[in-house]
UniProtKB/Swiss-Prot annotation:
Belongs to the TRAFAC class myosin-kinesin ATPase superfamily. Kinesin family. Kinesin subfamily. GO terms for cellular component: cytoplasm; kinesin complex; microtubule. The keyword Coiled coil applies. Residues 405-429, 643-665, 985-1006, 1044-1078, 1086-1109, 1132-1149 have a biased composition (Low complexity). Keywords: ATP-binding, Coiled coil, Cytoplasm, Cytoskeleton, Microtubule, Motor protein, Nucleotide-binding, Transport. It comes from Dictyostelium discoideum (Social amoeba). One of its GO terms (biological process) is microtubule-based movement. Residues 377-429, 573-600, 611-630, 638-665, 973-1016, 1032-1114, 1127-1193 are annotated as: Disordered. The gene is kif3. It is found in: Cytoplasm, Cytoskeleton. Residues 3-329 form the Kinesin motor domain. One of its GO terms (molecular function) is ATP binding. Microtubule-associated force-producing protein that plays a role in organelle transport. Its motor activity is directed toward the microtubule's plus end. The maximal velocity in an inverted motility assay (moving microtubules on fixed motors) was 1.96 um/s. This is Kinesin-related protein 3.
Length: 1193
């Protein structure tokens, strides 16, 4: 039992307190163990383990408050370090301080100094001890536990087991190999922590943060494991709303902070009050997580931070009272140790030897007590019964003692017999006690009484020792049972993981099938879309042709009306009704005669349109009788020109006076008839339209008739119903007047029976017709709705596609327009050049004319020969220039023609490109649809895989990438004389470790030489392998593993390390693991390392070629002295425990001109030992590897 250690720290007054007129009200005793608050009303005194004044340095706080806790952690205890106080009292400063590499190192807080202490202890530890350091960082925000290393985990659960205690499930654990790893984890957590600004603090913590550091120590010689957990708790400060000015979310946070702190106070009150039977740990997540730290298995130190100012007098007194109450809490701390099987056997053998010794000693005591009793009996002061009882008891005790020794000998082979042996041994002690009590009952001398007392005390001591040994045996058995239960739990977890993997495989197969089906459906959909687009295009073309034909019909109608008016006006209105008929008929016959050549075509069109129903003779008679009113279209089918000619001659003989106007009108009619022939096809189409309209009207009439028929039918059915009702009523009335029911059948007429049957038939038919009518009505409504939906969908798709096509066509037209403008501009420039050359040519021709005139004047008599020669030379020059210009002009003309041809060719090429672009856009549209479907499926599969990964991460298989390592690797102790081994300590460049083994590359400028001890491998056998050469070990990267990430390198060296683990041979006799390492070891040359392991001969060879020329072969062996593997479940790929590996290091033959630092000597800098377990075969996570990792944890 140990009390919580409480220390108090006061900070200096800040600007706000000085501005409010605050004064220091703190008085600290010279011994620094008590403090007095000079309050406004009364003074308050408090006693603590240590009180730090305002001028205390960070180092003093760490040495007095935190360093003892760290030492307890390294001894195997659980430790907790609380920081409690008002908001703005300096809690975070005490914990973290100011971590500035270039700043004052004295301002560093507890955490960075704690890191130094941990790694100093590791470096000073024995070389046979391996360390595994893990870190996690959580916060309690608004009563929700969040993982600060993985912000996606925002609502973690608290679990509890009897053997394991209380822990938070699902936290991210990062394996630590150096100081920078812990700092990276802390910085990541601090950056993700919830903070806000208040009046009292610019960066006020809005949550309780808990940093958990787990240190596991394994003694390779003995095989024991000690585990210590350190909880660094930075509590959020209690707040007073009037001082902080919290509003909104900040106010809600303050409420939850004060609530959790009040729950913590209630727990402390319940622990310090001896009358409380219940401790309210479950009232808050904070007290639930820190249950072991408050009254449990932990050594706890509480640092209370206070303000010395009178401005915060109430808060300071409340904080001090909290600390004084917490000082009374008692914890039950014990070393968390797991003994190996060898240790348990050694303890068991020791206990058995001590029991044997105690039994022999008991026998001696029994003999001594028997002699004493017999002497007393012979002297006459005792009774015979007493001696007899003592002798009998001694005999019985001797027999029981022999039985106990036999049971103990059997317990070596079977631990189940421990209870029987303990029971027999306890019976021996009871027998001895009975002997002594019997001997005491007899009257003895003073010497005898003293001897008896001494014997009684020795027996009591022996009995206590025996009980202790029995308790230790029980504890050992309990530990064995717990380990077996843990192994079973791990097996169950592995089975669950296997089932999850099978389900994921099934999901992947379903996903493949669905993708194949989707591809087939997409192809079919694309074909249907192409057919739909083709039909739409044809429909639009047909609609355009119909619109054009309608316009042509309208124009033909107007022209026909004009022709009719002209024909009507061509005759003379003053001539009698018979006289003018002759010229008109003759005027019509002439064009009909010309049109007789096409009689066959006209007859076919007339038959199609059903315009002419008369024979040719009837047409002639009608033309003779009614020529004034007949239309030119009706007379087109008259093909007998002879009758027409005769009719025309008769009319001319009777009316000679009207020949001249008739001939003139005849010419006009011929011209009009030609126009009619040209417009005849359009007229035929118009007549077809009129016939269609008639048909539509006929259809409408039929529909109206159908509606009237329907209404009449309904009326008829209603009348029939009324008649039926009347008949029934009449039957009822007639049945009421019947007096004698026996004569009813005789009196009922046969007609009434027939009417009843007819009524029943009519009712049945009516019901059937109604049902049929309703069914047809429903089907029609459904079809209409479906047609409307299809039309709406097609319309929307048409609009969307038209918009896309419009945009594309506009874009192409704009591009074509720009290209066309550029070509036209070029052509215009060339044309302008041609025009300019023609102008120059004209000017030269004018000059030649003037020169010729001058030449003529010169050739006249009296002209000078010199002037003629000069003019002749100028004329020659001009003709040469003209000839050159003509040649250039011809060239330009040919160039213009060529450019025109090129322009036309480019236009054709642009059209072809536009067509191909339209086709490509259609294909791209289809691909986009397919891509969208595939992306949706990919996202769904990705989400399922993320869920599986999250489940795997919960059992420790796939830890999140939080700046630390994902694979556990041990750190070997430095041997007691060496300094801290550093993997990467560079002031010029700091790189975060995110490789597969979370081990960054080594910078030669800042490495500490750490030679290993000479007897590292002497007289010991280990399960780890270490590269004990004058080079620096490079990190290993598991290629093909889910834990593989990129390895950042230092500025001076670039290393790429790959571990290719090939385990394709499942033969149990020979299972080889090849690890090829190709990287730059020591920063010089290309280095290749190969490690091979075979289960056939159980040997491991490490061949490292340094600088391309230096082979180093190092082999190691699995531990045969450590019996930790007894508790492991053997995997098929693991090495048998009986196998041994020979260590045969070869001396490296390194040339003097090659070195790691370029100076000709290999640097003696060494990395910490690299534990590589060669018993695993696959590089990926399998069930066997998961089982082994979980057993180690």
């Amino acid at each position: 039992m140990s009390s919580i250690r409480v220390v108090c720290r006061f900070r200096p007054q800040n600007k706000l307190e000085l501005a409010q007129g605050g004064d220091s009200i703190v008085s600290i005793a010279p011994e620094n163990d008590s403090v007095t608050i000079n309050g406004s009303e009364s003074n308050h005194s408090f006693s603590f383990d240590y009180v730090f004044p305002s001028n205390t340095t960070q180092r003093d706080v760490y040495d007095h408050a935190a360093k003892p806790v760290i030492e307890d952690i390294m001894a195997g205890y659980n430790g907790t370090l609380f920081v409690y106080g008002q908001t703005g009292s300096g809690k975070t400063f005490s914990m973290t301080g100011i971590n500035d590499p270039n700043g004052d190192q004295e301002l560093r807080g507890i955490v960075p100094r704690m890191i130094e202490t941990v790694f100093e202890f590791i470096s000073n530890a024995d070389e046979n001890i391996e360390f595994i350091v893990k870190a996690s960082y959580i916060e309690i925000y608004m009563e929700r536990i969040r993982d600060l290393l993985d912000t996606r985990k925002d609502n973690l659960k608290v679990r509890e087991e009897k053997g394991k205690g209380v822990w938070v499930e699902g936290t991210s654990e990062v394996y630590i190999y150096r100081e920078e790893d812990i700092l990276d984890v802390i910085n990541t957590g601090i950056s993700n922590r919830a903070i806000a600004e208040t009046r009292m603090n610019a960066e006020s913590s809005r949550s309780h943060s808990i940093f958990i550091l787990t240190i596991q120590q394994k003694n390779l010689k003995v095989g024991s494991i000690k585990t210590g957990k350190l909880y660094l708790v930075d509590l959020a400060g209690s707040e007073k709303i009037s001082k902080t000015g919290a509003q909104g979310t900040t106010l809600d946070e303050a409420k939850m902070i004060n609530k959790s702190l009040s729950s913590l106070g209630n727990v402390i009150n319940a622990l310090t009050d001896g009358k409380s039977t219940h401790i309210p740990y479950r009232d808050s997540k904070l007290t639930r997580v820190l249950q072991e730290s408050l009254g449990g298995n932990s050594r706890t130190t509480l640092i209370i931070n206070c303000s010395p100012s009178s401005y915060n007098e109430a808060e300071t007194i409340s904080t001090l009272r909290f600390g004084s109450r917490a000082k009374n809490i008692k914890n039950k701390a014990k070393i968390n140790q797991e003994r190996s099987a060898a240790e348990l056997k050694i303890l068991l053998s020791k206990a058995e030897n001590e029991i044997e010794n105690l039994k022999g000693y008991i026998k001696e005591l029994e003999t001594v007590s028997g002699v004493t009793v017999s002497n007393l009996k012979s002297s006459g002061s005792g009774s015979g019964s007493g001696s007899g009882s003592s002798s009998s008891s001694s005999g019985s005790s001797g027999g029981s003692g022999s039985g106990g020794s036999s049971n103990l000998s059997n317990s070596v082979n079977s631990t189940s017999n421990l209870n029987t042996s303990s029971n027999t041994s306890s019976s021996n002690v009871n027998a001895n006690a009975n002997v002594i009590t019997t001997s005491v009952s007899a009257p003895t001398s003073p010497k005898d009484t003293e001897l008896i007392k001494v014997l009684q005390e020795k027996c009591i001591q022996l009995e206590k020792q025996l009980f202790k040994k029995e308790e230790e045996k029980k504890e050992i058995l309990e530990q064995l049972e717990q380990q077996q239960e843990q192994i079973q739990d791990k097996d169950q977890e592995i089975e669950g993981l296997n089932s999850m993997i099978e389900s994921s495989n099934n999901i992947n197969s379903l996903y493949q099938n669905s993708t194949n089906e989707n591809s087939v459906l997409n192809v079919q959909l694309s074909e249907l879309k192409l057919a739909l687009e083709k039909s739409r295009f044809e429909a639009t073309e047909q609609s355009l042709t119909i619109e054009g034909l309608n316009e042509e019909n309208q124009s033909i109608k107007s022209q026909l009306e004009i022709l009719k008016d002209r024909i009507a006006q061509s005759g003379d209105s003053s001539i009698a009704s018979l006289v003018p008929s002759t010229p008109k008929s003759s005027a019509e016959m002439d064009p009909l005669a010309t049109a007789s050549k096409h009689a066959d075509e006209w007859n076919e069109k007339a038959e199609q349109l059903k315009l002419l129903q008369r024979t040719p003779s009837k047409a002639v008679g009608s033309s003779k009788s009614n020529t004034a009113t007949s239309s030119p279209i009706i007379s087109l089918n008259i093909s007998e020109s002879d009758n027409i000619g005769s009719g025309a001659t008769t009319t001319t003989n009777n009316n000679n006076a009207t020949i001249t106007p008739a001939t003139s009108s005849n010419n006009n009619v011929e011209q009009q008839q030609q126009q009619v022939e040209e417009l005849l096809p359009s007229v035929n189409e118009q007549l077809l339209e009129s016939e269609n309209q008639k048909l539509q009207k006929r259809i409408q009439e039929i529909e109206l008739e159908f509606e009237t028929y329907k209404i009449a039918k309904e009326n008829l059915t209603m009348q029939k119903d009324l008649e039926i009702e009347q008949l029934l009523e009449s039957q009822r009335i007639s049945s009421s007047f019947v007096v004698d029911p026996r004569n009813l059948d005789d009196e009922l007429p046969a007609e009434m029976m027939l009417q009843a049957e007819q009524i029943r038939k009519l009712i049945a038919e009516n019901s059937e017709q109604k049902v049929h009518f309703e069914a047809t009505k429903n089907e029609n409504s459904k079809l209409k709705n479906r047609i409307e939906m299809i039309e709406e969908e097609t319309r929307q798709r048409m609009e969307e596609e038209l918009n896309v096509l419009r945009e594309q066509t506009n874009q192409k037209l704009s591009e074509f327009g720009s290209l066309k403008e550029s070509l036209i501009r070029d052509l215009e420039n060339r044309c302008q050049k041609v025009i300019d050359l023609e102008l120059v040519l004209d000017e030269l021709q004018d000059r030649i004319v003037t020169l010729n005139e001058r030449l003529k004047r010169v050739n006249k008599p009296g002209g000078g020969d010199q002037e003629a020669a000069f003019v002749q030379s100028k004329l020659d020059e001009i003709t040469a220039v003209k000839h050159q210009l003509v040649i250039e002009n011809n060239k330009h003309k040919t160039e213009v023609e060529r450019l025109k041809k090129l322009l036309s060719h480019r236009g054709e090429h642009i059209l072809i490109l536009e067509k191909t672009m339209a086709i490509n856009q259609e294909s791209l549209f289809k691909l986009a649809l397919n891509h969208n479907a595939l992306t949706i499926e990919h996202d769904r599969a990705k989400n399922e895989l993320e869920k599986l990964n999250n489940l795997l991460s919960q059992v420790g298989v796939d830890a999140q990438n939080t700046g630390g390592a994902r694979v556990a690797r041990v750190i070997r102790g430095g041997g007691g004389n060496n300094q801290l081994k550093k993997f990467n300590h560079s002031s010029s460049s700091s790189t975060s470790s995110s490789s597969a083994l979370n081990h960054s590359s080594i910078n030669n400028n800042h490495t500490t030489p750490t030679p290993l001890s000479a007897n590292l491998y002497s007289n010991t056998k280990r399960s780890t392998k270490e590269l004990n050469t004058g080079v620096k070990a490079e990190p290993l990267s598991l290629s093909g593993s889910p834990f593989n990430t990129s390895i950042p390198s230092s500025p001076n060296h670039t290393s790429s390390n790959n571990i290719n683990n090939n385990s394709n041979n499942n033969n149990n006799n020979n299972n080889n693991n090849n690890i090829g390492n190709s990287g730059n070891i020591g920063g010089v040359g290309n280095n290749n390392s190969s490690i091979s392991n075979s289960n056939n001969n159980s040997s491991s060879n490490l061949n490292a070629n340094l600088n391309g020329n230096t082979p180093v072969k190092i082999t190691s062996e699995n531990s045969s002295s450590s019996l930790w593997n007894i508790f492991k479940k053997k995997s098929p790929s693991s090495t048998p425990p009986s196998s041994t590996n020979n260590l045969s290091p070869q001396s490296p033959q390194t040339p003097s001109h090659l070195s790691a630092d370029g100076s000709g000597n290999i640097s003696p800098n060494l990395s910490p030992p690299i534990p590589v377990n060669f018993s695993y075969t696959p590089a990926v996570v399998t069930s066997s590897t998961i089982n082994k990792d979980q057993q180690k944890d």
